[in-house]
Protein backbone atom coordinates (compact mmCIF):
# COMPACT_ATOMS: atom_id res chain seq x y z
CA UNK A 1 0.00 0.00 0.00
CA UNK A 2 1.38 3.42 -0.95
CA UNK A 3 1.60 6.08 1.72
CA UNK A 4 0.00 9.48 1.26
CA UNK A 5 3.45 11.02 0.79
CA UNK A 6 4.20 8.63 -2.08
CA UNK A 7 0.84 9.36 -3.70
CA UNK A 8 1.49 13.12 -3.50
CA UNK A 9 5.01 12.62 -4.88
CA UNK A 10 3.67 10.59 -7.80
CA UNK A 11 1.10 13.28 -8.58
CA UNK A 12 3.68 16.07 -8.43
CA UNK A 13 6.06 14.17 -10.71
CA UNK A 14 3.57 13.56 -13.50
CA UNK A 15 5.03 14.49 -16.87
CA UNK A 16 1.85 16.16 -18.02
CA UNK A 17 1.47 19.64 -16.58
CA UNK A 18 -1.70 19.04 -14.63
CA UNK A 19 -0.79 21.88 -12.26
CA UNK A 20 1.08 25.17 -12.49
CA UNK A 21 0.95 26.62 -8.99
CA UNK A 22 0.65 24.45 -5.90
CA UNK A 23 0.91 25.01 -2.15
CA UNK A 24 1.95 21.88 -0.24
CA UNK A 25 1.08 22.32 3.43
CA UNK A 26 1.76 20.19 6.46
CA UNK A 27 2.83 20.39 10.08
CA UNK A 28 6.47 20.23 11.13
CA UNK A 29 7.86 16.74 10.59
CA UNK A 30 5.00 15.63 8.33
CA UNK A 31 7.30 14.90 5.39
CA UNK A 32 7.43 18.17 3.43
CA UNK A 33 11.22 18.22 3.41
CA UNK A 34 11.35 14.59 2.28
CA UNK A 35 9.06 15.40 -0.65
CA UNK A 36 11.18 18.40 -1.64
CA UNK A 37 14.34 16.28 -1.51
CA UNK A 38 12.78 13.62 -3.73
CA UNK A 39 11.69 16.25 -6.25
CA UNK A 40 15.17 17.78 -6.17
CA UNK A 41 16.61 14.45 -7.40
CA UNK A 42 14.65 14.64 -10.67
CA UNK A 43 17.24 14.19 -13.46
CA UNK A 44 14.83 14.94 -16.31
CA UNK A 45 14.35 18.63 -15.58
CA UNK A 46 15.87 21.56 -13.73
CA UNK A 47 14.79 21.92 -10.10
CA UNK A 48 15.74 25.03 -8.09
CA UNK A 49 14.82 25.59 -4.44
CA UNK A 50 14.51 29.16 -3.11
CA UNK A 51 13.91 30.71 0.28
CA UNK A 52 12.99 34.31 1.12
CA UNK A 53 15.09 35.59 4.04
CA UNK A 54 14.04 38.74 5.91
CA UNK A 55 16.50 40.49 8.23
CA UNK A 56 15.67 42.23 11.51
CA UNK A 57 15.78 45.54 9.60
CA UNK A 58 13.03 44.35 7.27
CA UNK A 59 15.31 43.86 4.26
CA UNK A 60 14.50 40.77 2.20
CA UNK A 61 16.60 38.65 -0.15
CA UNK A 62 16.10 35.44 -2.08
CA UNK A 63 18.59 32.64 -1.35
CA UNK A 64 19.06 29.63 -3.65
CA UNK A 65 19.27 26.73 -1.19
CA UNK A 66 19.49 23.94 -3.78
CA UNK A 67 19.95 23.40 -7.52
CA UNK A 68 20.19 20.03 -9.27
CA UNK A 69 22.23 21.40 -12.19
CA UNK A 70 25.57 19.57 -12.30
CA UNK A 71 27.30 22.52 -13.94
CA UNK A 72 26.55 26.23 -14.05
CA UNK A 73 24.17 25.90 -11.12
CA UNK A 74 23.24 28.83 -8.90
CA UNK A 75 23.22 27.18 -5.47
CA UNK A 76 23.96 29.58 -2.56
CA UNK A 77 23.31 32.62 -4.77
CA UNK A 78 21.61 35.63 -3.18
CA UNK A 79 19.25 37.90 -5.13
CA UNK A 80 17.29 40.99 -4.18
CA UNK A 81 13.53 40.90 -4.57
CA UNK A 82 13.66 43.15 -7.63
CA UNK A 83 16.18 40.99 -9.47
CA UNK A 84 14.91 37.54 -8.43
CA UNK A 85 12.74 36.89 -11.50
CA UNK A 86 15.40 38.07 -13.96
CA UNK A 87 18.20 36.17 -12.26
CA UNK A 88 16.08 33.03 -12.13
CA UNK A 89 15.35 33.28 -15.86
CA UNK A 90 19.07 33.85 -16.57
CA UNK A 91 20.01 30.80 -14.49
CA UNK A 92 17.54 28.62 -16.40
CA UNK A 93 18.78 29.86 -19.80
CA UNK A 94 22.38 28.90 -18.98
CA UNK A 95 21.33 25.26 -19.32
CA UNK A 96 18.66 23.51 -21.35
CA UNK A 97 15.92 23.89 -18.73
CA UNK A 98 12.55 22.93 -20.14
CA UNK A 99 9.56 22.71 -17.83
CA UNK A 100 11.60 23.66 -14.74
CA UNK A 101 10.33 23.18 -11.21
CA UNK A 102 10.80 26.06 -8.76
CA UNK A 103 10.35 25.14 -5.08
CA UNK A 104 9.69 27.91 -2.54
CA UNK A 105 10.49 26.91 1.07
CA UNK A 106 8.71 28.32 4.15
CA UNK A 107 6.03 29.94 2.01
CA UNK A 108 3.84 30.54 5.06
CA UNK A 109 6.36 33.17 6.20
CA UNK A 110 6.16 36.56 4.45
CA UNK A 111 3.68 35.07 1.99
CA UNK A 112 2.54 38.44 0.60
CA UNK A 113 6.06 39.34 -0.50
CA UNK A 114 6.45 35.88 -1.97
CA UNK A 115 3.23 36.30 -3.98
CA UNK A 116 4.37 39.67 -5.36
CA UNK A 117 7.75 38.33 -6.48
CA UNK A 118 6.21 35.11 -7.77
CA UNK A 119 3.91 36.93 -10.19
CA UNK A 120 6.90 38.44 -12.02
CA UNK A 121 8.68 35.08 -12.17
CA UNK A 122 5.58 33.33 -13.54
CA UNK A 123 5.25 35.85 -16.37
CA UNK A 124 8.92 35.36 -17.37
CA UNK A 125 8.90 31.55 -17.11
CA UNK A 126 5.63 30.42 -18.74
CA UNK A 127 6.57 26.73 -18.90
CA UNK A 128 7.67 26.47 -15.25
CA UNK A 129 5.93 24.87 -12.32
CA UNK A 130 6.02 26.57 -8.92
CA UNK A 131 5.66 24.51 -5.75
CA UNK A 132 5.26 26.42 -2.49
CA UNK A 133 5.91 24.50 0.74
CA UNK A 134 4.81 25.65 4.20
CA UNK A 135 2.76 25.02 7.29
CA UNK A 136 -1.02 25.30 7.67
CA UNK A 137 -2.25 28.86 8.13
CA UNK A 138 -5.82 29.94 7.37
CA UNK A 139 -4.86 33.45 6.32
CA UNK A 140 -2.10 32.20 4.02
CA UNK A 141 -4.34 29.53 2.52
CA UNK A 142 -7.09 32.09 1.88
CA UNK A 143 -4.70 34.46 0.10
CA UNK A 144 -3.23 31.64 -1.99
CA UNK A 145 -6.70 30.47 -3.03
CA UNK A 146 -7.53 33.98 -4.26
CA UNK A 147 -4.46 33.80 -6.52
CA UNK A 148 -5.60 30.48 -8.00
CA UNK A 149 -2.95 28.41 -6.23
CA UNK A 150 -3.93 24.78 -5.72
CA UNK A 151 -3.71 23.57 -2.11
CA UNK A 152 -2.49 20.05 -1.29
CA UNK A 153 -2.41 18.94 2.34
CA UNK A 154 -0.22 16.10 3.52
CA UNK A 155 -2.87 15.58 6.18
CA UNK A 156 -2.94 13.18 9.08
CA UNK A 157 -1.31 9.79 8.86
CA UNK A 158 -3.54 6.75 8.56
CA UNK A 159 -3.29 3.91 11.06
CA UNK A 160 -1.25 1.93 8.53
CA UNK A 161 1.17 4.84 8.00
CA UNK A 162 1.49 5.41 11.74
CA UNK A 163 2.40 1.80 12.35
CA UNK A 164 4.81 1.75 9.40
CA UNK A 165 6.59 4.88 10.63
CA UNK A 166 6.95 3.48 14.15
CA UNK A 167 8.21 0.08 12.97
CA UNK A 168 10.55 1.44 10.28
CA UNK A 169 14.06 0.13 11.02
CA UNK A 170 13.01 -1.30 14.42
CA UNK A 171 12.85 -4.97 15.40
CA UNK A 172 9.80 -4.90 17.67
CA UNK A 173 8.27 -8.15 18.97
CA UNK A 174 4.58 -8.78 18.26
CA UNK A 175 3.83 -5.30 16.87
CA UNK A 176 0.20 -6.11 16.04
CA UNK A 177 -0.48 -7.14 19.63
CA UNK A 178 1.46 -4.19 21.04
CA UNK A 179 0.32 -1.32 18.79
CA UNK A 180 -3.42 -1.39 19.34
CA UNK A 181 -5.78 1.21 17.90
CA UNK A 182 -5.93 2.95 21.29
CA UNK A 183 -2.12 3.12 21.57
CA UNK A 184 -1.76 4.39 18.00
CA UNK A 185 -4.36 7.08 18.63
CA UNK A 186 -2.46 8.30 21.71
CA UNK A 187 0.89 8.29 19.89
CA UNK A 188 -0.63 10.11 16.91
CA UNK A 189 -1.99 12.79 19.24
CA UNK A 190 1.45 13.30 20.82
CA UNK A 191 3.52 13.17 17.61
CA UNK A 192 1.11 15.18 15.40
CA UNK A 193 2.46 13.57 12.24
CA UNK A 194 6.10 14.32 13.07
CA UNK A 195 7.93 11.30 11.66
CA UNK A 196 10.99 12.04 13.77
CA UNK A 197 8.89 11.64 16.91
CA UNK A 198 7.32 8.49 15.50
CA UNK A 199 10.80 7.08 14.92
CA UNK A 200 11.63 8.01 18.52
CA UNK A 201 8.52 6.12 19.66
CA UNK A 202 9.65 3.02 17.76
CA UNK A 203 13.17 3.18 19.18
CA UNK A 204 11.85 3.68 22.73
CA UNK A 205 9.50 0.70 22.42
CA UNK A 206 12.33 -1.52 21.10
CA UNK A 207 14.75 -0.50 23.85
CA UNK A 208 12.10 -0.98 26.56
CA UNK A 209 11.27 -4.45 25.22
CA UNK A 210 14.94 -5.40 25.38
CA UNK A 211 15.42 -3.95 28.86
CA UNK A 212 12.25 -5.47 30.37
CA UNK A 213 12.43 -8.74 28.38
CA UNK A 214 8.74 -8.51 27.54
CA UNK A 215 6.59 -8.20 24.44
CA UNK A 216 3.70 -6.34 26.06
CA UNK A 217 3.73 -3.31 28.32
CA UNK A 218 1.91 -2.35 31.48
CA UNK A 219 0.02 0.93 31.79
CA UNK A 220 2.93 2.37 33.81
CA UNK A 221 5.41 1.51 31.04
CA UNK A 222 3.17 3.10 28.41
CA UNK A 223 2.95 6.27 30.52
CA UNK A 224 6.75 6.42 30.53
CA UNK A 225 6.80 6.15 26.73
CA UNK A 226 4.15 8.85 26.42
CA UNK A 227 6.18 11.18 28.67
CA UNK A 228 9.22 10.70 26.43
CA UNK A 229 7.03 11.76 23.49
CA UNK A 230 5.99 14.95 25.30
CA UNK A 231 2.95 14.01 27.38
CA UNK A 232 3.03 16.18 30.51
CA UNK A 233 -0.55 15.78 31.67
CA UNK A 234 0.31 13.93 34.91
CA UNK A 235 2.62 16.77 35.92
CA UNK A 236 -0.14 19.29 35.30
CA UNK A 237 -2.52 17.28 37.45
CA UNK A 238 0.03 17.15 40.28
CA UNK A 239 0.59 20.88 39.97
CA UNK A 240 -3.17 21.48 40.12
CA UNK A 241 -3.43 19.39 43.31
CA UNK A 242 -0.52 21.25 44.93
CA UNK A 243 -1.94 24.64 43.95
CA UNK A 244 -5.40 23.71 45.25
CA UNK A 245 -3.91 22.60 48.57
CA UNK A 246 -1.89 25.80 48.83
CA UNK A 247 -4.94 27.98 48.16
CA UNK A 248 -7.01 26.11 50.77
CA UNK A 249 -4.23 26.40 53.36
CA UNK A 250 -3.79 30.12 52.73
CA UNK A 251 -7.54 30.72 52.91
CA UNK A 252 -7.87 28.88 56.23
CA UNK A 253 -4.84 30.68 57.62
CA UNK A 254 -6.26 34.04 56.62
CA UNK A 255 -9.64 33.29 58.23
CA UNK A 256 -8.02 32.13 61.49
CA UNK A 257 -5.48 34.96 61.65
CA UNK A 258 -7.87 37.43 63.32
CA UNK A 259 -8.33 35.15 66.35
CA UNK A 260 -4.59 35.12 67.11
CA UNK A 261 -3.50 38.68 66.49
CA UNK A 262 -4.95 39.93 69.80
CA UNK A 263 -3.20 37.31 71.97
CA UNK A 264 0.12 36.54 70.28
CA UNK A 265 3.01 39.05 70.22
CA UNK A 266 4.32 40.23 66.87
CA UNK A 267 7.69 38.60 66.07
CA UNK A 268 10.63 41.00 65.95
CA UNK A 269 11.45 40.03 62.37
CA UNK A 270 8.01 41.26 61.28
CA UNK A 271 8.46 44.74 62.78
CA UNK A 272 9.52 47.15 60.02
CA UNK A 273 12.99 48.53 60.57
CA UNK A 274 13.51 52.24 60.09
CA UNK A 275 16.26 52.63 57.48
CA UNK A 276 19.44 54.16 58.81
CA UNK A 277 21.01 56.77 56.56
CA UNK A 278 24.69 55.92 56.20
CA UNK A 279 27.12 58.75 56.67
CA UNK A 280 29.37 59.68 53.81
CA UNK A 281 32.45 57.46 53.76
CA UNK A 282 35.59 59.31 52.89
CA UNK A 283 38.09 56.53 53.25
CA UNK A 284 41.15 56.68 51.04
CA UNK A 285 41.28 53.83 48.54
CA UNK A 286 44.99 53.49 49.34
CA UNK A 287 44.02 51.96 52.70
CA UNK A 288 41.96 49.18 51.06
CA UNK A 289 43.51 45.72 50.71
CA UNK A 290 42.38 42.98 48.30
CA UNK A 291 44.34 39.95 47.08
CA UNK A 292 44.38 38.71 43.47
CA UNK A 293 42.30 35.63 44.37
CA UNK A 294 39.76 37.86 46.14
CA UNK A 295 39.49 40.04 43.03
CA UNK A 296 38.85 36.98 40.86
CA UNK A 297 36.25 35.80 43.37
CA UNK A 298 34.49 39.18 42.97
CA UNK A 299 34.67 38.83 39.17
CA UNK A 300 33.10 35.37 39.38
CA UNK A 301 30.36 37.00 41.46
CA UNK A 302 29.72 39.55 38.70
CA UNK A 303 29.10 36.56 36.39
CA UNK A 304 26.68 35.09 38.92
CA UNK A 305 28.94 32.40 40.42
CA UNK A 306 29.76 32.22 44.12
CA UNK A 307 33.38 31.07 44.34
CA UNK A 308 35.39 31.36 47.61
CA UNK A 309 38.57 33.40 47.36
CA UNK A 310 40.71 30.36 48.21
CA UNK A 311 39.28 28.51 45.18
CA UNK A 312 39.01 31.44 42.77
CA UNK A 313 41.54 30.60 40.08
CA UNK A 314 41.36 30.56 36.30
CA UNK A 315 41.44 26.76 36.09
CA UNK A 316 37.98 26.75 37.71
CA UNK A 317 36.47 28.82 34.88
CA UNK A 318 36.05 25.86 32.52
CA UNK A 319 33.50 24.32 34.91
CA UNK A 320 31.17 27.22 34.08
CA UNK A 321 31.98 27.22 30.36
CA UNK A 322 34.18 30.29 30.81
CA UNK A 323 37.79 31.08 30.01
CA UNK A 324 40.30 33.60 31.34
CA UNK A 325 41.92 36.14 29.06
CA UNK A 326 44.72 38.44 30.18
CA UNK A 327 47.17 40.92 28.72
CA UNK A 328 47.76 44.64 28.31
CA UNK A 329 45.41 47.00 26.46
CA UNK A 330 44.16 50.56 26.36
CA UNK A 331 41.04 51.63 28.22
CA UNK A 332 39.12 52.12 24.96
CA UNK A 333 40.03 48.61 23.76
CA UNK A 334 38.64 47.07 26.94
CA UNK A 335 35.52 49.23 26.74
CA UNK A 336 34.96 47.95 23.19
CA UNK A 337 35.26 44.35 24.44
CA UNK A 338 32.26 45.16 26.68
CA UNK A 339 33.24 42.83 29.54
CA UNK A 340 34.10 43.57 33.19
CA UNK A 341 37.78 43.03 33.97
CA UNK A 342 40.33 43.04 36.78
CA UNK A 343 42.70 46.00 36.65
CA UNK A 344 45.83 46.48 38.76
CA UNK A 345 46.16 49.93 40.34
CA UNK A 346 49.52 51.14 41.64
CA UNK A 347 48.47 53.26 44.61
CA UNK A 348 51.47 54.60 46.47
CA UNK A 349 53.89 51.74 46.99
CA UNK A 350 51.38 48.91 46.74
CA UNK A 351 49.44 47.08 44.02
CA UNK A 352 45.64 46.93 44.36
CA UNK A 353 43.54 44.69 42.05
CA UNK A 354 40.03 46.04 41.38
CA UNK A 355 37.12 44.81 39.24
CA UNK A 356 36.01 47.38 36.66
CA UNK A 357 32.24 47.11 36.14
CA UNK A 358 31.33 50.49 34.62
CA UNK A 359 33.05 53.03 32.41
CA UNK A 360 31.23 56.33 31.98
CA UNK A 361 32.13 59.54 30.20
CA UNK A 362 34.08 60.99 33.14
CA UNK A 363 34.24 58.26 35.77
CA UNK A 364 34.92 54.57 36.33
CA UNK A 365 33.20 52.27 38.84
CA UNK A 366 35.31 49.52 40.39
CA UNK A 367 34.45 46.80 42.90
CA UNK A 368 36.72 46.23 45.89
CA UNK A 369 35.22 43.47 48.01
CA UNK A 370 31.62 44.48 48.77
CA UNK A 371 32.20 48.17 48.04
CA UNK A 372 31.93 50.14 44.81
CA UNK A 373 34.33 53.04 44.27
CA UNK A 374 33.68 55.75 41.72
CA UNK A 375 36.98 57.02 40.30
CA UNK A 376 37.65 59.79 37.82
CA UNK A 377 38.95 58.80 34.40
CA UNK A 378 42.09 60.86 34.81
CA UNK A 379 43.05 59.41 38.18
CA UNK A 380 42.18 55.82 37.16
CA UNK A 381 44.39 55.95 34.07
CA UNK A 382 47.23 57.54 36.06
CA UNK A 383 47.39 54.62 38.53
CA UNK A 384 46.29 51.75 36.25
CA UNK A 385 49.20 49.65 35.02
CA UNK A 386 47.39 48.80 31.76
CA UNK A 387 47.02 45.08 32.46
CA UNK A 388 43.74 43.19 32.57
CA UNK A 389 42.24 39.81 33.39
CA UNK A 390 38.71 39.01 32.25
CA UNK A 391 36.33 36.07 31.94
CA UNK A 392 34.44 35.31 28.75
CA UNK A 393 31.99 32.63 27.65
CA UNK A 394 33.14 30.22 24.94
CA UNK A 395 31.04 28.19 22.51
CA UNK A 396 28.72 25.47 23.91
CA UNK A 397 31.45 22.87 23.27
CA UNK A 398 34.13 24.99 24.92
CA UNK A 399 35.79 26.26 21.74
CA UNK A 400 37.14 29.77 21.21
CA UNK A 401 36.04 29.87 17.56
CA UNK A 402 33.36 28.35 15.34
CA UNK A 403 34.39 27.52 11.75
CA UNK A 404 33.23 25.35 8.86
CA UNK A 405 35.21 22.51 10.49
CA UNK A 406 33.23 22.73 13.75
CA UNK A 407 30.68 20.09 14.70
CA UNK A 408 27.15 20.17 13.30
CA UNK A 409 25.84 20.96 16.79
CA UNK A 410 28.07 24.05 17.03
CA UNK A 411 27.06 25.31 13.57
CA UNK A 412 23.37 24.68 14.30
CA UNK A 413 23.70 26.60 17.60
CA UNK A 414 25.45 29.47 15.81
CA UNK A 415 22.75 29.85 13.16
CA UNK A 416 20.00 29.57 15.78
CA UNK A 417 21.59 32.38 17.82
CA UNK A 418 22.07 34.53 14.71
CA UNK A 419 18.45 34.00 13.64
CA UNK A 420 17.26 35.15 17.06
CA UNK A 421 19.57 38.15 17.13
CA UNK A 422 18.69 39.24 13.59
CA UNK A 423 14.97 38.34 13.92
CA UNK A 424 15.18 35.95 10.96
CA UNK A 425 12.41 33.36 10.83
CA UNK A 426 14.00 30.69 8.60
CA UNK A 427 14.83 27.21 9.89
CA UNK A 428 18.47 26.94 11.10
CA UNK A 429 20.81 24.52 9.34
CA UNK A 430 23.76 22.45 10.56
CA UNK A 431 25.67 23.16 7.33
CA UNK A 432 28.25 25.92 6.87
CA UNK A 433 26.75 27.85 3.95
CA UNK A 434 27.45 31.23 2.35
CA UNK A 435 24.11 32.34 3.79
CA UNK A 436 25.45 31.66 7.29
CA UNK A 437 28.56 33.75 6.60
CA UNK A 438 26.33 36.62 5.45
CA UNK A 439 24.34 36.38 8.68
CA UNK A 440 27.60 36.49 10.67
CA UNK A 441 28.71 39.62 8.82
CA UNK A 442 25.33 41.28 9.30
CA UNK A 443 25.45 40.56 13.05
CA UNK A 444 29.01 41.90 13.27
CA UNK A 445 28.07 45.05 11.39
CA UNK A 446 25.06 45.74 13.61
CA UNK A 447 27.28 45.45 16.73
CA UNK A 448 30.14 47.55 15.29
CA UNK A 449 32.52 44.57 15.11
CA UNK A 450 35.05 43.73 12.42
CA UNK A 451 32.93 42.50 9.50
CA UNK A 452 35.02 39.51 8.44
CA UNK A 453 32.59 36.60 8.85
CA UNK A 454 34.89 34.96 11.43
CA UNK A 455 33.28 33.80 14.68
CA UNK A 456 35.90 34.42 17.35
CA UNK A 457 36.20 36.12 20.71
CA UNK A 458 34.29 39.35 20.00
CA UNK A 459 31.45 37.73 18.03
CA UNK A 460 30.91 35.02 20.66
CA UNK A 461 30.91 37.62 23.45
CA UNK A 462 28.19 39.69 21.76
CA UNK A 463 26.13 36.60 20.81
CA UNK A 464 26.01 35.48 24.45
CA UNK A 465 25.24 39.03 25.61
CA UNK A 466 22.33 39.35 23.17
CA UNK A 467 21.02 36.05 24.56
CA UNK A 468 21.31 37.44 28.11
CA UNK A 469 23.80 34.74 29.16
CA UNK A 470 26.93 36.84 29.65
CA UNK A 471 28.12 39.57 31.97
CA UNK A 472 28.74 42.94 30.35
CA UNK A 473 30.34 46.28 31.09
CA UNK A 474 27.92 48.95 32.28
CA UNK A 475 28.02 52.28 30.48
CA UNK A 476 25.87 54.48 32.77
CA UNK A 477 25.89 55.21 36.50
CA UNK A 478 22.23 54.31 37.10
CA UNK A 479 22.82 50.59 36.64
CA UNK A 480 25.17 50.26 39.64
CA UNK A 481 23.45 49.46 42.95
CA UNK A 482 26.07 48.07 45.37
CA UNK A 483 25.75 47.65 49.11
CA UNK A 484 28.14 50.52 49.76
CA UNK A 485 29.22 53.22 47.35
CA UNK A 486 32.38 55.14 48.17
CA UNK A 487 33.43 58.20 46.23
CA UNK A 488 37.07 58.02 45.24
CA UNK A 489 39.43 60.07 43.16
Curated annotation (Swiss-Prot):
Keyword Transport: yes
Keywords: ATP-binding, Cell membrane, Membrane, Nucleotide-binding, Transmembrane, Transmembrane helix, Transport
Compartments where found: Cell membrane
Domain of life per record: Bacteria
Transmembrane segments: 237-257
Broad class of the protein's primary localization: membrane
Residues making up the signal peptide according to the UniProt record: none
Residues binding ATP: 26-33
InterPro entries: AAA_22, ExeA_AAA_ATPase_DNA-bind, GspA_C39-like, P-loop_NTPase, Peptidoglycan-bd-like, PGBD-like_sf, PGBDSf
One GO MF term attached to the UniProt entry: ATP hydrolysis activity
Gene Ontology cellular-component terms listed: cytosol; plasma membrane
Membrane topology value: Single-pass membrane protein
Induction: Silenced by the DNA-binding protein H-NS under standard growth conditions.
SUPFAM superfamilies from the UniProt entry: P-loop containing nucleoside triphosphate hydrolases (SSF52540), PGBD-like (SSF47090)
Function of the molecule: May play a regulatory role under conditions of derepressed gsp gene expression.
Further comment found in the protein's record: Part of a cryptic operon that encodes proteins involved in type II secretion machinery in other organisms, but is not expressed in strain K12.
Family label: Belongs to the ExeA family.
Name of the molecule in the record: Putative general secretion pathway protein A
Protein encoded by which gene: gspA
Amino acid sequence: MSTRREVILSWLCEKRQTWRLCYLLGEAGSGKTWLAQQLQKDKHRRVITLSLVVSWQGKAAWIVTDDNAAEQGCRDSAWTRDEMAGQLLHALHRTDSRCPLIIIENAHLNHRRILDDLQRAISLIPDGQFLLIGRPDRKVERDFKKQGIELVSIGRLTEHELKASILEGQNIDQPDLLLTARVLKRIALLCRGDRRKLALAGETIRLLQQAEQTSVFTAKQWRMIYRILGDNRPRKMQLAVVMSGTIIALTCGWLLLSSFTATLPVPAWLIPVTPVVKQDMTKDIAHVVMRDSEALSVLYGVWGYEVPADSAWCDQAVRAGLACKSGNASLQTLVDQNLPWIASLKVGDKKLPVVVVRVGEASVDVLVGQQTWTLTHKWFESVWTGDYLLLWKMSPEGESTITRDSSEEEILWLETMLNRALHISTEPSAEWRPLLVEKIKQFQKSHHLKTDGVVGFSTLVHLWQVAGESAYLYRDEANISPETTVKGK
